[in-house]
Each structure stands twice: as structure tokens, then as C-alpha cells.
Amino acid sequence: MLQPKRTKFRKVMTGRNRGLAKGTEVSFGEFGLKAVGRGRLTARQIEAARRAMTRHIKRQGQIWIRVIPDKPSVQKPLEVRQGKGKGSAVYWVAQIQPGKVMYEMNGVPEELAREAFRLAARKLPVKTTFVTKQVM
């Protein structure tokens, strides 16, 4: 699963997920899966969507993952009283804003890519749409 090799700090503040995304254009592949809503993707969700796409296209073509879970999400253990500091980092999340292209695909027909992205979107907690590369 995806996570940073090293970070400057072990824990970060929760913060807010406001604003619009960077990386809103399909730049590497021919087709893309773009977020319409906002939310948090865990490393497990990103990997589950990648597996669903890879299995559907039967390992032909190429897939790019454009989101990186770089924010630790912390939890306290079960049956532990409140207080005594912040919990330990359990998993990693990527914050998603509207307009972010999360996955890209190349080397497959459009119908196959559309169906693969539909299967991947079922694994993700944000609403998505299918986009193609803009030719100028």
C-alpha cells in the first residue's frame, strides 16, 4: 500500500478539506477518473480501486495513480480512556478536492476503460466522473 517513506512529523493536525484541486487535467494517459465531490481516500481504498481496474483490463494498457496518501490518520486503541495525548498513526489518507484526476489509463479501448473506472469508482467514497484527454 502507498505511504510516504519518511515524514518530517509523525502526526499532523486534522485541518479542513476546502478549496479546489490541483491536477485537474488528464496528463499522462488517455482516459481519467475525476473526483466530483470531496473526501478522504485511505491507502486501502486506493489499492482496492487499482486492483479492480487492473483485473478488469487483464493487465493490458497502463494505469497511473495520481493521488498519494501523505497524511497520517490517528486512532486510540479500544477501551482506552480519553486524554493522555493523541493516538498513534494507524493508516494514511489522501485528501481529495473536486476536480482532482485520481487515476489515468492508456492503451485500452474507451468502453473497456469506462467499465474499469466504473468498477474502481465503486470502491471509492467520493463521487467521480469519466474524463478523456483534451486534444488542442
UniProtKB/Swiss-Prot annotation:
Keywords of this protein's UniProt record, alphabetized?
Answer: Ribonucleoprotein, Ribosomal protein, RNA-binding, rRNA-binding, tRNA-binding
Annotated membrane-spanning segments are: none
- Can the keyword Ribonucleoprotein be found in this entry's annotation? yes
NCBIfam families cross-referenced by the UniProt entry:
rplP_bact
The UniProt entry's GO CC annotations, sorted and at most eight, read:
cytosolic large ribosomal subunit
Q: What family classification does the UniProt entry report for this protein?
A: Belongs to the universal ribosomal protein uL16 family.
Which species does this protein come from? Answer: Vibrio atlanticus (strain LGP32)
GO terms (BP aspect): translation
For the keyword Isomerase, the answer is no
For this entry, the protein name equals Large ribosomal subunit protein uL16
Organism domain of life: Bacteria
Which gene holds the coding sequence for this protein? rplP
State one Pfam family annotation. Answer: Ribosomal_L16
GO MF term (any one): structural constituent of ribosome
Q: List the disulfide bonds.
A: none
The role this protein plays is: Binds 23S rRNA and is also seen to make contacts with the A and possibly P site tRNAs.
